[in-house]
Amino acid sequence: MVKVKSEIDFLKELQETETIKALQENYDFWAFSKIDEHLDNLFIPYFNNAAERRFFPDFIFWLQKGGTQIICFIDPKGSKHTDYEHKADAYKLFKGKVFTPKDNPHFKIQVVLKFYGNKDDVGEKYRDDWIQKDKLKDFFLKLSLIERG
């Protein structure tokens, strides 16, 4: 059960007709799930104060178009953004990279991490890592597949 306001806001926006329409019209396949950090062993490692930590984003999306799949992690944040910088910095290791499974060299996988909420108080360096609340549909419309060079 989802009880955190920022997650509830995200799910409400996801359920809007225009957001669903954007997903259905722009991807051959899409699915999403809430990540449960107590059940799922799905995390992004990062360092904070020289200690290794585990970041469990709240939601994961699988978006496929043709031979490319985007694995998109979205982590809604409330009005007080805390500790996102270290998590965003850890994601930079994957940002812009395209992965190819050994058993299917024509298939491409791209990993995306975004935070969701009001990005007015977010530092300039991290603004591109955020989806502005009430702009989720636009994010899915503008999310581009990286072509392998």
Model-derived regions, located:
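Electrostatic, structured charged patches in enzyme active sites and in nucleic-acid/phosphate-binding
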Residues: 1-149
